[in-house]
């Protein structure tokens, strides 16, 4: 039975409990990749009550905000970022429904969400001239197309699908995962975030249960993009924290001091002055990333799901952009520095510590970090308002 979580502190405690369950099996799930669906890990997440924490109060949910979601995601990502990423789009779709869904759509889908059922995504496509050049179409109430990078779709109850309608307008359709004409593949073959199993989904005249005008969501000041990016940032910061934790544990229990460190008087690896300097610097940067994430989340709490003005929307978007850009850099850095700190033995395959770097590098290219810095600079130097889309 899925529990209900109504308070921030309870959500954080639950996330830590889930993380404690996930951590021992993270390396095994990484090695298995798409060859084994992480059913037990996902069941722990689904049964925890965390899937429903952002459902609005008006729709029967607890209505917890970005600060709660960011902290929950960061904690779980530090244990297993693949499992943390599975519900990333789930929370975005909840936000879209909350703002743009009609009462019938919200009741249908939020009832399932509050019962511990997930919303998966089928938003991305390949082969077009650009990322928004969609081929998937809705006509006559059915959906036809092929989607890639469908995180969460394989084991979800519903799939949110971006498509063009008869008029060429962007819409968001919801179809049952087990409905007619829906086929989700396990062809996810990448170096990192392997247990997300973000494979290909094919829709062949699949009946659509709910349709939302998605284009209009980004034609007004909005925070959907910023809130979606906040969870992406939390995954990166969680990876950084997990890498730092494993570096600390390895240094304390397995690493030996180098010849030069012994000559300098070190009795253990943790006494090596260069290790101490590098670790201290890295720990500071990881904590800075955590602080920037928390600050961005607090800003989104203040702005709200529907911003009062373009200025408020800009404030939220830029706060998250900074957290996402810096968090991505620190995640890759921490995962690489782990080996410089811990030494050659830490590269042994049996430890699977390279999964931190593979996860960070794979997830960090979800969308370009350089454009985050570009828009931050454009606003501060020239008062140029950032764009309004799903990645900002």
Regions flagged by a language model, labelled:
Residues 17, 239, 246, 281, ...:
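Charged, amphipathic alpha-helical oligomerization/scaffolding segments
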Residues 340-392:
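Glycine-rich phosphate/cofactor-binding loops in nucleotide/flavin-utilizing enzymes
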Residues 39-46, 52-151:
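Glycine-rich flavin
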Residues 260-271, 302-319, 344-362, 388:
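Charge-rich, acidic-biased intrinsically disordered regions
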């Amino acid at each position: 039975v899925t529990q209900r979580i109504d308070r921030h502190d309870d959500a954080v405690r639950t996330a830590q409990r889930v993380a404690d369950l996930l951590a021992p099996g993270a390396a095994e799930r990484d090695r298995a990749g798409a060859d084994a669906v992480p059913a037990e890990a996902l069941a722990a997440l689904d049964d925890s009550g965390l899937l429903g924490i952002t459902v609005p109060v008006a729709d029967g949910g607890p209505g917890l905000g970005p600060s709660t979601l960011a902290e929950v995601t960061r904690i779980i990502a530090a244990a297993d970022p693949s499992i943390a990423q599975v519900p990333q789009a789930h929370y975005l779709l909840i936000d879209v429904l909350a703002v743009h869904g009609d009462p019938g759509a919200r009741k249908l889908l939020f009832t399932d969400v509050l019962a511990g059922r997930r919303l998966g995504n089928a938003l991305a496509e390949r082969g077009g001239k650009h990322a928004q050049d969609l081929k998937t179409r809705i006509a006559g109430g059915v959906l036809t197309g092929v989607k890639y990078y469908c995180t969460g779709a394989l084991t979800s109850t519903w799939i949110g699908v971006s498509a063009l309608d008869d008029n060429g307008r962007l819409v968001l359709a919801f179809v049952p995962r087990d409905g007619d004409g829906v086929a989700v593949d396990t062809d996810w073959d990448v170096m990192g975030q392997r247990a997300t199993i973000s494979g290909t989904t094919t829709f062949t005249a699949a009946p659509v249960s709910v349709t939302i005008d998605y284009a209009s969501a980004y034609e007004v000041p909005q925070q959907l993009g910023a809130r979606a990016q906040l969870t992406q940032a939390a995954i990166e910061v969680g990876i950084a924290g997990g890498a730092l934790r494993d570096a600390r544990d390895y240094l304390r229990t397995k690493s030996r001091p180098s010849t030069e460190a012994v000559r300098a008087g070190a009795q253990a690896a943790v006494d090596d002055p260069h290790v101490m300097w590098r670790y201290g610097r890295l720990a500071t940067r990881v904590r800075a990333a955590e602080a920037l994430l928390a600050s961005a989340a607090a800003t989104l709490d203040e702005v709200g799901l529907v911003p009062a003005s373009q200025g408020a929307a800009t404030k939220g978007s830029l706060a998250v952009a900074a957290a996402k850009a810096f968090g991505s850099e620190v995640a890759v850095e921490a995962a690489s520095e782990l080996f410089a700190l811990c030494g050659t033995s830490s590269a042994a395959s049996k430890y699977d510590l390279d999964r931190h770097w593979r996860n960070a590098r794979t997830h960090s290219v979800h969308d370009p970090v350089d454009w985050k810095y570009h828009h931050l600079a454009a606003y501060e130097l020239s008062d140029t308002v950032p764009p309004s889309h799903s990645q900002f």
